[in-house]
UniProtKB/Swiss-Prot annotation:
Matches recorded under CDD domains: MopB_CT_Nitrate-R-NapA-like (cd02791), MopB_Nitrate-R-NapA-like (cd02754)
Keyword field: 4Fe-4S, Electron transport, Iron, Iron-sulfur, Metal-binding, Molybdenum, Nitrate assimilation, Oxidoreductase, Periplasm, Signal, Transport
Record protein name field: Periplasmic nitrate reductase
Catalytic activity: 2 Fe(II)-[cytochrome] + nitrate + 2 H(+) = 2 Fe(III)-[cytochrome] + nitrite + H2O
Keyword ATP-binding: no
């Protein structure tokens, strides 16, 4: 028998990786079982978008492996990806709806008891109708969704809320991870998502990581970065972070900086480029405008907070005024290497070495960033400022030169951003505040004019505040564990969920912290149990077919959304004057208006893929995934967000939009690569009316909360390689749980010694908002500098978000999980 290279990779990659990690061999490395059907899928975890091969036997996923035909991961998976087959089969998987009850009826303080789906939707409909009939009813219902929703789940939810209930109180958990990236793109370019792609990795000369531990959070991309660094002569890697982590092992220019001073470092780089006369004058003259951003914008806290007082531009944080290049030059001139070195704690020679990488016109640079930038009280600013650097040099929109925002969730791009499940967005970068955009959406959705509410809904952090204040009363959480992952859960999150005025529904496959705080839990189908689509960080849309049997364990989010819509007649949710504009809708349900509208329901069951069980199609009598996708795609076709026909994605390993005439786009905004840039235009940032990107003058600003004599340490939160987000899936995989069973507090040995602590001691970590008990680790993979501690958030037994502050970027409304003040003492 002979093995092809592809077969060799399939046979050896999994056991080799498991052995290297010291874990038990995954199922795929065991002797092959008979009658296993293999098909392509997409990894359930981060935003890299790795393709996997999924093995199914008797309706159960029994094995997965990296897909050798994938252009993203090329046959590899990270350690989480190799155990994907086990995430759906935890012993505590939920199978029936559960309602808090006492004496046979709902009671907010009752115990969870199983009920039927009809009973669940009946009480949900009762609670929603009770709120919607109030004069301000549209503000009293809300939903918190997910960057883990499939594309059509997010789209269906957006239609239900923004069109059906006429409420924009829909926001995704991507608000906590990607909102600053979105705001940064929109402010600088007028259009969202990266202009480059992963192919940049193999064509660049230097990598700069800003607040990104790619070695653990995006390990497959890191393997490609490592390969480039080790095989391309002269290739350099710079890593900037507030603490040392595994990505530092490859760093030629390692930099640990004081929290929040990345703002100053970015301005120093611009100053260096201009002072050395290294900037690309021709590019700037043709393709850039300069803007002075508003300052004194606050910290996104409650208006009564002391930090929100006397903030002149808190109401208009996105404001920007024109300025000249010379004015920008003068603005950044104060950020000298001496000043920034003192402020940031980074030696001057390292700052200069970093600036030289960007300033050398012969060196192609890829800048990667993720939560260290985005989860920041000035998250939009730092996104704008990294674009400043690339735009000054013209190092953008071409192979190997790319500012690249990495994504944390599998479809934060494809669902949250592109579909527009944020409280202010519609599909294809449209927004609810724009009259023309609302008209387009109403036309696409076949709705009467004036249906969509022009008022922005409650964003994620505001939703918790409104729940606590009793102003948001019927609330549905789907595909996310927000009680564990949202900030300041003691003061804002938990009180809101348990407010007697509120009815909280959580759809989840497992009894998470969030589910256990709810009033009603709906069991959901997971991953390969349903037909799905994700969009990854490089604009790649990928599909998969339904492989497992979901109906016996739970119902998909899509089915739940569409089925719930049947409980509402138009007369119960729309005012009479709106119905009068389209009287033929009178008497119809929201299901008929939104999903059986002649567009979503136009694809019959005969178009389903043979050999796959589609529970939603069986339930509704048509192919809803195809209908929803094609209706959604109509928003972006011809508007630089073009998606290919539905069938194309089931055949391909994903396509990067815009897809025009069957061809995907690798680099946007540059002639020869982007079909929306005409011959002779060279570079065109067509998201802006004049085709020019914006460079912003934005200053250093201190953090919302810093260490003081009472709380003397910075706290930063984040993840580890073996677990993903809140651990609700990975902690149910025995091998992953065994490898890292609990979170620890990473601490500098000197900080431990000052407190008479030793490695492994049990400690109490306290902030002004709460406290947790954990163990300290002074010898681990993460090595904080003195004065800072780091703790992951995957462990539900140690809820680190009891400690965090709910400060946000005032522009993006994204939470800063990286900076608050704590004290540590022996427990």
């Amino acid at each position: 028998m002979s093995l092809t290279r592809r077969d060799f990779i399939k046979a050896n990659a999994v056991p080799a990786t498991a052995a290297a990690a010291g874990l038990a061999t995954p199922a795929i490395a065991q002797p092959a079982k008979a009658n296993i059907r293999w098909d392509k899928g997409v990894c359930r975890f981060c935003g890299t978008g790795c393709s996997v091969l999924v093995g199914v036997q008797d309706g159960r996923v029994v094995a997965t492996q990296g897909d050798p035909d994938s252009p993203v991961n090329r046959g590899l998976n990270c350690i989480k990806g190799y155990f994907l087959s086990k995430i759906m089969y935890g012993e505590d998987r939920l199978t029936r709806p559960l309602l808090r009850m006492k004496d046979g009826k709902f009671d907010k303080n009752g115990e969870f008891q199983p009920i039927s789906w009809d009973q669940a939707f009946d009480i949900m409909a009762e609670k929603w109708k009770e709120q919607l009939k109030k004069p301000d009813g549209v503000t009293r219902v809300g939903m918190f969704g997910s960057g883990q929703w499939t594309i059509w789940e997010g789209y269906a939810a957006s239609k239900l809320y923004k069109a059906g209930f006429r409420s924009n109180n829909l926001d995704p958990n991507a608000r906590h991870c990607m909102a600053s990236a979105v705001a940064g793109f929109m402010r600088t370019f007028g259009i969202d998502e990266p202009m480059g792609c992963y192919d940049d990795i193999e064509q660049t000369d230097a990598f700069v990581l800003w607040g990104s531990n790619m070695a653990e959070m995006h390990p497959i991309l890191w393997s490609r970065v490592t390969d480039r660094r080790l095989t391309h002569e002269g290739c350099k890697v710079a890593v900037l972070s507030t603490f040392e982590h595994r990505s530092f092992e490859l760093a030629d220019i390692p930099m640990v900086f004081t929290p929040q001073t990345d703002l100053a470092i970015l301005n120093y780089i611009c100053h260096y480029i201009i002072s050395k006369n290294a900037y690309n004058k021709e590019f700037i003259d043709k393709h850039v405008n300069f803007k002075k951003g508003a300052t004194d914008i606050g910290y996104g806290l409650r208006p009564t907070h002391a930090l929100e007082k006397d903030q002149a531009n808190a109401a208009t944080p996105d404001k920007a005024d024109p300025m000249t290049f010379d004015e920008f030059k003068a603005f950044v001139a104060e950020y000298t290497v001496e000043k920034v070195s003192k402020l940031s704690g980074v030696p001057a020679d390292k700052l200069e070495a970093l600036a030289k990488l960007y300033a050398d016109p012969k060196v192609k640079v890829v800048s990667f960033w993720t939560m260290g930038f985005n989860q920041h009280t000035r998250g939009t600013w730092v996104n704008n400022m990294i674009y400043n650097v690339h735009l000054l040099m013209g190092k953008i929109s071409e192979p190997g030169n790319s500012p690249f925002s990495l994504t944390g969730q599998p479809s934060a791009c494809g669902t949250a951003r592109e579909v527009g499940t944020f409280a202010h967005r519609l599909p294809a970068d449209m927004v609810v505040m724009n009259d023309k955009h609302r008209e387009i959406a109403e036309r696409c959705w076949k709705l009467p004019a004036g249906t969509i509410n022009p008022k922005i809904g409650y964003h994620a952090v505001l939703q918790h505040r409104m729940l606590k204040d009793g102003k948001l009363n019927a609330y549905w959480v789907m595909c996310t564990n927000n009680m564990q992952t949202a900030p300041n859960m003691n003061e804002e999150g938990y009180p809101g969920y348990r407010n007697p005025a509120n009815f909280i529904v959580v759809s989840d496959p497992y009894p998470t912290v969030t589910a256990l705080a709810a009033d009603l839990i709906l069991p959901t189908a997971m991953w390969m149990e349903k037909e799905g689509a994700y969009g990854n960080a490089e604009r790649r849309t990928q599909f998969w077919a339904p492989e497992g049997q979901g109906s016996g364990r739970g119902r998909s989010d899509l089915w739940q959304i569409m089925e719930f819509s049947k409980r509402f007649k138009i007369e119960e949710v729309w005012p009479e004057e709106l119905i009068a504009k389209k009287p033929e809708l009178r008497g119809k349900t929201l299901f008929e208006v939104l999903y059986k509208n002649g567009q979503v329901d136009k694809f019959p069951l005969t178009e389903l893929q043979a050999g796959f069980e589609n529970d939603e199609a069986k339930a509704f009598g048509f192919y809803p995934q195809k209908g929803l996708f094609e209706e959604y795609a109509s928003f972006g076709r011809g508007h630089a967000h073009d998606l290919a026909p539905f069938e194309s994605y089931h055949k391909a390993r994903g396509l990067r939009w815009p897809v025009v005439d069957g061809k995907e786009t690798l680099w946007r905004f540059r002639e020869g690569y982007d079909p929306y840039v005409k011959a002779g235009e060279g570079v065109k940032f067509y998201g802006k009316p004049d085709g020019k990107a914006w460079i912003f003058a934005l200053p250093y600003a201190p953090a919302a909360e810093s260490p003081d004599k009472d709380f003397d340490l910075w706290l930063s939160t984040g993840r580890v390689l073996e677990h993903w987000h809140s651990g609700s899936m990975t902690r149910r995989v025995p091998e992953l749980h065994k490898s890292v069973p609990n979170a620890v507090l990473y601490m500098h040995p000197n900080d431990a010694a000052k407190r008479n602590l030793r490695n492994g001691d049990v400690v109490k970590v306290a902030s002004r908002r709460g406290e947790v008990t954990t163990r300290i680790d002074t010898r681990g993979r993460n090595k904080p500098p003195e004065g800072l501690v780091f703790m992951p958030f995957f462990d539900e037994s140690q809820l680190v978000n009891k400690l965090t502050l709910d400060a946000t970027c005032p522009i993006s409304k994204e939470t800063d999980y990286k900076k608050c003040a704590v004290k540590v003492s022996k427990a």
